[in-house]
Amino acid sequence: MKLSFIVPIYNTEPFILERCFESINCIEKLEYECILIDDGSKGEIGEFCADYSNNHKRFKYFRKKNGGVSSARNEGIRKAKGEYIYFVDSDDTIITDVFDQFVHGYENADLVFTDLILVDGQHKCRWGNMLGTTYDMVLKRLIMDGKINGPYAKFWKKDFLERNGLLFDETMVSGEDALFLLSFLCCNPKMMYANVDTYLYYKESKSGDNRISMYPYICIQDCEKKYKKILECIECGNYEKKEKVELMIQETEQLIHELFGLEMSMISVNVWDSKANSKFTEIIENINGDLCEKVNKISKLKLGIMKS
């Protein structure tokens, strides 16, 4: 099985890039390529990536005009030659040892979930323990804690992505990872789970960005887009009626929580205005009234504040 690692890059410091690249370069037996997609980084970053790829034949460097991480990942998907794709953020690393021994036994899957380790300073926390890989189980896990939303620590079958026209939504600036997985689920994939850690996610290197100040209205739309998609997926599931309603309530509580946090952030960076208020009002009014009645007290309080 040939694997394509896709690493989107935007102004990541060279010493952090080297940490990422070296974790992949240490793989010995697995046939792979590593596709570096430079999303318009400043000059010295591009030079470092180009030099590294020139000295490591399995690394391929491509530079493109800045279009966001979804655009970079999509470019990587189009260029990938491997049977499976594995996404790596440029400030994270893979757990090298497992890749040489992992690949056998999963060749028929369209998506293989693995586990990751969250690194937060000196603390490490394992994110894993999937209870199952049916549509209903994966969707429920996505709703319950959001720990499987990201594209990393997963092996995506390239042919399945192509046959179903699956790409990341380049119009979104937040929530695009979850929407990609939701769209994938809707295509009836064969999914498997490997109880093995393959990825180190470095929380301390994830600097806060300025998406809210730059794209406030898109951030609002993204919240609604993800919410509608999840409700649509819940409707398509084989849940009992009671469980289906419970999942919808939980997702509605999550939407309210996200909208409330977004409103506070927009106010703090001075981008809250009448247009934003109008968009919030429209989203809130479109939430099913029965669901609003059934959310918890904290959600009702937040909803009341946003309506005032």
Regions found by a protein language model. Name each.
Residues M1-S23:
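N-proximal low-complexity "stem/linker" segments adjacent to membrane-targeting elements
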Residues S4-P8, I35-L36, R63:
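Short hydrophobic beta-strand elements that form part
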Residues E22-E31:
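Short, acidic, metal-binding catalytic loop of nucleotide-sugar glycosyltransferases
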Residues D38-F48, D89:
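A conserved acidic beta->alpha catalytic loop
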Residues Y61, L262-S308:
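Membrane-interface aromatic/basic loop that binds lipid-linked glycans or pyrophosphate carriers
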Residues I85:
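Short aromatic/hydrophobic "clamp" motif used to bind/position activated sugar donors
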